[in-house]
């Protein structure tokens, strides 16, 4: 959700197709891993990753994104894809091509008992709670604060907002940096679960785009619901499809085909949403 929220803010408000958003996620994971190795503090790792990637976001917005905003979406796709290639090469130069280890906090390494017969990993539960809290905070920021009103005003009518004294370029810089920091936090939190490696941003970017399309571009609520639906469909598919396929095919075939069909189910869900709600389930208004 954090990655989808950052990207939907940038695309929905700034009208920038930023394929390099996954590279910011990757940068956050690598910085967090490096900080964790040096300090041993996971909290410091997350904070340093967010700040460092936020600084990268400032540089990227001032040097490239601000210029790409004046171009069409094709130029934006090509320009930000070039950033992906550069980021991957920089990561290889600094950390090497091998995956980097990022350990989760020792206090959250075990399970917690949710029900008498149900144990759940404490770290994953923390991520869920953090994601829900972040969703509520972002929704409140965009819809209930003066800064959020200014952001939406700048997105709706830039010229009118400028005439009213709003510094739209500075406002959009803040939105882009916020998106970069959200991606970095997501990378730091998911690093202990997934492998911190070169190209990890591209792997998750497709799913993030699916979440945004399902939920509605520019909508925080839509990004949250889209991420929730994608996660539920993927998890349910991986859990139940192999069981169903074993009724027809051999266990080996069912185990290999089931996860593939679960991934396909995500895109079937997206297609169904686009047929009945072309703007997504919760499109941004105004």
What are these regions (language model features)?
Residues 40-51, 173-183, 187-188, 193-267:
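Transmembrane alpha-helical segments in multi-pass inner-membrane proteins
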Residues 40-84, 90, 225-230, 234, ...:
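Alpha-helical transmembrane segments within multi-pass membrane transporters and channels
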Residues 13-59, 63, 240, 244-254:
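Membrane-embedded helix boundary and interhelical linker motif in transport proteins
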């Amino acid at each position: 959700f954090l990655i989808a929220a950052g990207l939907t803010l940038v695309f929905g408000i700034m009208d920038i197709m930023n394929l390099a958003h996954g590279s910011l996620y990757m940068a956050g994971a690598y910085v967090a891993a490096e900080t964790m190795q040096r300090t041993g503090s996971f909290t410091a790792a997350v904070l340093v990753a967010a700040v460092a990637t936020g600084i990268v976001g400032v540089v990227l917005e001032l040097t490239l994104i601000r210029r790409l905003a004046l171009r069409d979406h094709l130029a934006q796709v090509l320009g930000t894809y070039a950033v992906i290639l550069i980021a991957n090469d920089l990561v290889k130069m600094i950390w090497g091509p091998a995956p980097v280890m990022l350990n989760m906090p020792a206090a959250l390494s075990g399970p917690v008992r949710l029900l008498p017969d149900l144990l759940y990993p404490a770290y994953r539960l923390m991520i869920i709670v953090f994601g829900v809290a972040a969703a509520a905070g972002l929704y409140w920021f965009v819809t209930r604060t003066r800064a959020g009103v200014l952001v939406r005003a700048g997105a709706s009518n830039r010229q009118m907002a400028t005439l009213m004294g709003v510094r739209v370029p500075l406002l959009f810089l803040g939105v882009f940096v916020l998106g970069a920091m959200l991606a970095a936090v997501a990378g730091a939190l998911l690093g202990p679960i997934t492998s911190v490696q070169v190209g990890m941003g591209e792997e998750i970017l497709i799913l993030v785009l699916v979440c945004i399309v399902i939920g509605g571009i520019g909508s925080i609520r839509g990004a949250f619901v889209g991420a929730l639906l994608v996660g539920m469909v993927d998890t349910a598919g991986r859990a139940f499809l192999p069981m169903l396929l074993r009724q027809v095919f051999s266990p080996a075939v069912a185990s290999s085909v089931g996860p593939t069909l679960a991934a396909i189910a995500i895109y079937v869900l997206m297609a169904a949403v686009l047929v009945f709600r072309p703007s997504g389930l919760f499109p941004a208004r105004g």
